[in-house]
Amino acid sequence: MDEFFEKVKSQQDPFKRLASLIPGFGGYIERQNRRDADKLLRDTVARRFDEQWKRTSQLQVEMVSSGMIQYVDDMERAALQLRTFIDKISTAPRGYSGLFDAVKINEKELEAIYQYDAAFFDLGEQVARALDHVEASLGDREALPAAIRNVTSLARTAVETYNRRSEVVIGDGK
């Protein structure tokens, strides 16, 4: 998230830079920048997962065209899990009070949040590879069910990871 935070900070208008010199106002600007960086990060993750969701839908069309209708429902479960994750991460409120309202941020919590954020990008790559495997397995009716289950499992993991990140952000994480 540091990369996103620095990007937001560098795009700050001159008025905000000047106002950040006013005592107390700098904390406000800092919170706003963190909120903006968090939103930018979540939008980026959502776009990457949306690409995979579209691939999932396209694979369903290919299954129907190839007469593999019996696998479409399983693939739909994977698509629904992906869509659930995309909707959660893209529609979450901009900034959370537990993370953004305090001027001083707990480094341990921030590190945990960064780890979850990195996990989202890793999960996106894993989903892409799993969908590659589904696509490669379209001709192998024995391997296809396991490949689809893997996509569903990874999509479910993305939703669970988002929920755990939210717990850390709002202060309910253990």
Regions of interest found by a model, annotated:
Residues 54-147:
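Charged linear interaction tracts used for macromolecular binding and regulation
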Residues 137-174:
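Preference for long, well-ordered alpha-helical segments
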Residues 1-60:
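Leu/Val/Ala/Ile-rich N-terminal alpha-helices, chiefly Sec-type signal peptides and the beginnings
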